[in-house]
Regions:
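The feature marks the mature, well-folded catalytic cores of soluble enzymes
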Residues: 1-101, 111-315
Length: 315
């Protein structure tokens, strides 16, 4: 298992580092690769999306590094090491952001650290269009052991405050079987250019996820852009079921990663469905190369491409 998933991470690292700088957090030194910086920090797990900084950038290029509390998806798993990574990186002058901010940090880098550790929020639980709208799911943000006793209204106001959002669109259906996160939106619905939403669908009425995904689709049809127009909806196929013993795994094509000039897309050795998913994603990103990454080894850990990465603004 370790060798299999290590090979997958190597492939992801190569594809990213070909196009942009890469920062890897690891517990020990490793052989360097081009455009890659290694930071030696212990962690509980590999899901950088959920404990990494959420970065806001204004029109003048100033960055705000939001450090929210990560508590192992509602205290399901240990998280104390993961929850300390952001502060450690910041003290080391990482991530390497634009010098537009002041004062500069260690190593001459910059960016304003914002302590949001009194509020639980995972990066995989939100999607933003960069124009004032943030999408999230009620299943995740209102789940026990995250931000109780805060109400939905109080949580929404905090999201608007910290993320500088004008509105929050809540998705009430769609949690995938085997998803430990209580319904992260990055497994279900992704925002793409031209007000396009790529979302997971299911055409098999006998599939246990069929009803929830159908209800999610119906809700998405009611959503409007901040300008009052319907979103352009594109449905992604559902991979045929993966199991770990008797447990179904949350395989999804929505967990793709947008990088410079490319989109890295999870595949599952299902040529027909993989090709269909890559075609649909390619239609949403016509100016980017679409690169498939076999993520069968990662999905065995109940995550995928987007889950194990977190982007930062370029220098």
């Amino acid at each position: 298992m370790l060798g299999e998933i290590t090979a997958t991470y190597h492939e992801i690292a190569r594809e990213i580092s070909r196009r942009e700088n890469l920062l890897i957090v690891a517990p020990e030194e490793a052989q360097p690769i081009i455009n890659c910086q290694l930071s030696i920090i212990n962690s509980n797990d590999t899901w950088a999306r959920d404990h990494g900084f959420i970065t806001l950038t204004d029109d003048e290029g100033h960055h705000r590094l939001l450090d929210f509390c990560f508590n192992g998806w509602g205290e399901k798993f240990p998280a104390e090491l993961d929850n300390a990574i952001n502060r450690r990186l910041y003290d080391e002058g990482l991530p390497p952001l634009s010098p537009a901010d002041s004062p500069p940090r260690a190593g001459g880098q910059s960016g304003k650290y914002v302590d949001c550790l009194d509020f639980v929020l995972e990066g995989g639980s939100i999607e933003s269009d960069g124009r004032g709208t943030v999408f999230t799911t009620t299943g995740c943000l209102l789940a026990p052991h995250r931000n109780q006793p805060l109400t939905k209204t109080q949580i929404e106001e905090r999201l608007k405050l910290e993320l500088h959002a004008e509105r929050i669109l809540w998705i009430d259906h769609g949690n995938l079987t085997g998803d430990d996160t209580d319904g992260h939106i990055d497994t279900l619905v992704r925002i793409c250019p031209e007000d396009t939403l790529l979302y997971m669908g299911c055409d098999d009425p006998d599939d246990e996820q069929y009803d929830e995904l159908r209800l999610m689709e119906e809700q998405l049809k009611t959503f409007r852009t901040i300008d009052g127009r319907p979103y352009r909806l594109k449905k992604l196929p559902m991979p045929r079921p993966f199991y770990d013993g008797d447990d179904r795994l949350p395989a999804t094509y929505a967990n793709f990663l947008i990088i410079n000039d490319a989109v890295l897309c999870p595949t599952y050795a299902q040529p027909d469905l993989d090709a269909e998913a890559l075609r649909i994603i390619g239609e949403a990103f016509p100016d980017r190369e679409i690169v498939g990454i076999d993520c069968r080894s990662i999905i065995k850990q109940h995550g995928s491409l987007h889950c194990c990465t977190m982007q930062f603004p370029s220098i």
